[in-house]
């Protein structure tokens, strides 16, 4: 009546209470876990690379001009624009002509960008002459006569379009 099993009886436990690992089942689980971890690392790395590629700056291209914003009159009755980008032509004019501001309603701010990248800003009023405005722009940025005439026609169209709204 021996209570201790004999080594040849076919039990799965080794002496000392350890499991018999010779069948490879646990090794298969460990290999599977390692392979899964490696795959997860590769997927995360690929996602990071894709995110980096997506956030790189695109090649520079000309930006759309800002939308024209309605600026209400001040309570004191003055019509000074609060937009510093659109400066009045009388202040920045270097031609020496000190024409007073037309008393008409301000329609829009014309910004002409030359080929060199210089921007000329002129405020166009309701009573302005398109020829005078195109001359003022060409005083800051030399224009060919055909370009000056095309600018004059475009200013006429814009004034007519905005006057029909008012």
Swiss-Prot record:
Pfam families, A to Z: UPF0561
Domain of life of the organism encoding this protein: Eukaryota
Family of this protein: Belongs to the UPF0561 family.
Transmembrane regions: none
Biased segments, Basic and acidic residues type: 36-49
The protein, known as: UPF0561 protein C2orf68 homolog
Renumbered residue ranges of the record's region Disordered: 36-108
């Amino acid at each position: 009546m021996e209570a201790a099993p004999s080594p040849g009886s076919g039990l799965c436990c080794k002496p000392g209470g350890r499991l018999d690992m010779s069948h490879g089942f646990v090794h298969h689980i460990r290999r599977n876990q390692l392979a899964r971890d490696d795959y997860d690392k590769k997927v995360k790395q690929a996602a990071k690379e894709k995110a980096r590629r997506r956030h790189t700056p695109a090649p520079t291209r000309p930006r759309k001009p800002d939308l024209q914003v309605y600026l209400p009159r001040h309570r004191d009755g003055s019509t000074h624009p609060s937009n510093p980008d659109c400066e009045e032509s009388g202040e920045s004019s270097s031609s020496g002509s000190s024409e007073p501001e037309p008393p008409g309603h301000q329609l829009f701010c014309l910004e002409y960008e030359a080929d060199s990248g210089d921007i000329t800003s002129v405020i166009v009023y309701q009573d302005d002459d398109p020829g005078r405005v195109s001359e003022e722009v060409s005083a800051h940025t030399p224009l060919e006569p055909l370009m000056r005439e095309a600018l004059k026609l475009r200013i006429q169209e814009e004034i007519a379009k905005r006057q029909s709204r008012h």
